[in-house]
Amino acid sequence: MSNLQPAPPETEGTSLGRARLGVFGIVFFVVAAAAPLVGMTGAVPVAIVLGNGAAVPGTYLLVGIILLLFSVGYATMSHHVTNTGAFFAFIGRGLGVAVGVGSAFVSLVAYLAIQLAIFGFFGVVMAGEMAARFGLEAEWWIWVLIAWALVFVLSWFSVDIGAKLLGILLILELLSLAIVGLAVLFSGGGPEGMQLGDSFLPSAIFAGAPGIAFAFAFASFIGFEATAIYGEEAKNPKRTVPRATYLAILVITILFAVVSWAMVSGIGSSVIIEETVGITGELADPAALLWAVTDQYVGSWLTEIMKVLVLTSLFAGLLAFQNSAGRYFFSMGRAGVLPKALDRVNKYRAPSAGSIATTVITGIVIVWFAIQGLDPFANLFSWFSALAVVAIVLVEMLVCVAIIAYFRKTKEDTRPWNTMIAPILALIGLVAGEYLLIAKFALLAGTAADGSDPTVDSFALNTTGWILVLLPFAILILGAVWGKARVSKENEDLIKDLVS
């Protein structure tokens, strides 16, 4: 690790490309990271069966509202802090450099973890599709390493190149989901029609096992906070970033709430749990639920297209999180928290050193999982996706506290709703969400203790589960200690370089 150094003047080698992204370019990266088609085929069916049944759409809506409340303060803060470190910088400004550094390490681990999780899911789906469609039998890790190399190549170029590719893939993905939702809506739903109350009334949302549904819903939103990461590359970031944040959350919320409602209504709200169990083979193939609804209300032709789009959705997520992790490495290197060499950019103004670091780390983990013979879904995907969502929600909680502290201290914005009320409401929702995530971590990560039932028991984790769930908190503490140690050796003036 290098010592903290003042941020150097912007030169060709240490500054990102300016004014490359507009609102929609940033939204493409963020919504692509959420991988809505993957969520519809994976998280939604599981939440229906193990969570609160027909009320899963309302759960997504409620989580979306919590995150919109979070975004009020987040967007307000982005007017005062424009930095590729985003959360790192926000928390540093509000709670001090030590906590800011700790949160930076937590965020970085979260982005690396979710990318690894997507690699695992991609390997499973790609291996299955290639074998079924073309008879090409190959180990999951072969397809993963091909995607790993391609993601690195694309991340090497200007950020707007990646945005254009993600835009094309995302439009196809959203269009396919919209067709399914509208088809069910215009047909009036299944035998029971379009039941609003069964899906959106509070009494329905908090029935059954809502904790499981909320855990999966929060997991489906991971990546939305990445809007501010692109602040330095945005056109007019003080306007672009807040707009992109609100728009991204609205798109994700509406998409998950409406399409999952269409899935529930298409089958029938009173029988959705039993039918989902039967259609998916007791969740052995959760994607079968969406395929069944699509077959019935649109046609098998769209189902076949969507099976391919699941792969493009996963690939889009890989590229989005590659960009996020690379930019965190860049920001932390520029601040001196990590080696200064990480703040280098290439001729395309992309964070080349950060991208290399991300690629090397993920490559090592993928190869290790392959050598050990671990399962790409049960281990690589489940472990790292659960770890990532706990880490991100932890950092979001700190951001809420930092926003309140920052504006109380500086008085730069005195609007109560933006700087106090909305952040407090969001904090309450996020704390509740984090509790549910940890309580049901065994179900999310597949790390239940021997003899326990993760669908019923809370906090029943094996050793691996406890290591994963406590890791973000340990990293926060160790990172804060590291940050304080670095600053204590330096001039107080360097704090601004670290958090701005």
What are these regions (language model features)?
Residues M1-A55, L67-L68, V72, M194-S203, ...:
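Membrane-interface "cap" regions at the ends of multi-pass membrane proteins
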Residues E12-A19, P57, R133-E139, I168-K307:
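Helix-loop-helix junctions that connect adjacent transmembrane segments
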Residues T41-W140, T463-A480, V487:
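Extracellular loop-to-transmembrane helix junctions
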Residues A43, L62, L387-V395, W417-S500:
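A generic transmembrane alpha-helix motif of multi-pass inner-membrane proteins
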Residues V46-P57, V124, G128-W140, D160-L170, ...:
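Transmembrane helix-loop boundary segments of multi-pass membrane transporters
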Residues N83, V106-F121, F221, A226-A234, ...:
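Membrane-helix boundary/coupling elements in multi-pass transport proteins
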Residues A89-F90, G96, G128-A132, A244-L319, ...:
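TM-loop-TM module centered on a large, flexible mid-protein loop between adjacent transmembrane helices
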Residues W140-P191, A244-T253, A391-L394, K409-I428:
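Membrane-interface loop-to-helix entry segments
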